[in-house]
Every structure is written in structure tokens, then in C-alpha cells.
């Protein structure tokens, strides 16, 4: 049985890791073992960050809606409650966008939710 040398495969694997570690500081981008650890850590942070981003944006939207609602003399919880009662299906992202970009339409949505 012939001897199989895996030089090509190993080099490609290391180059792939070092390419991913580009931009890291010092030995974190030069030495394979350290770079490999840092790439794995970075991938874990990236995964967690993608989950955290959803939470942070939702809380940002809620804060913006609450601020706009308080300018109009009401609270966030009562706004959401009145929207649900009047069966107005608009999500928090759209409400927050409306509150920032077009406050007049936000007030109209609030008044229509309160009216019904």
C-alpha cells in the first residue's frame, strides 16, 4: 500500500484558518495554533452576537415607541394594548420607524387605535 502524504491538505487547512485570522493583532494572525484558537473564539462571539442583535434591536424599538408615546401623553404598554384590541397588526419595528421618521402618521395610528 502506498504512503499517503497529506502535505497539500494540511497546508490548505492552515492557510484557510490564517486567512480568517487576517486583521487580528500580533501572533493571533501569524501563528497557526494561536490563530486557530482566536478564529474559533471569534466564531463563537459572532454566533452569540447574531442572537444578541435581535434582542438589542427589539429593546431599541420599544424605547423609541415609548418615547414617542410619552410625547403624546400615553405609555408604551397602553399603546401596544390598544393596538392589539383594535386589531391593528403593525410590528414594533414599523412603529418605531414611524415614530422617528414620520411622527404625524404615528399620532394617527395612536388615535385610530384609541378610537376603536
From Swiss-Prot:
GO terms for cellular component: chloroplast; ribonucleoprotein complex; ribosome. Coiled coil: none annotated. GO terms for biological process: ribosomal large subunit assembly; translation. The lineage of its organism: Eukaryota, Cryptophyceae, Pyrenomonadales, Pyrenomonadaceae, Rhodomonas. The gene is rpl20. It holds the Pfam family Ribosomal_L20. This is Large ribosomal subunit protein bL20c. Binds directly to 23S ribosomal RNA and is necessary for the in vitro assembly process of the 50S ribosomal subunit. It is not involved in the protein synthesizing functions of that subunit. Keywords: Chloroplast, Plastid, Ribonucleoprotein, Ribosomal protein, RNA-binding, rRNA-binding. Belongs to the bacterial ribosomal protein bL20 family. The keyword Signal does not apply.
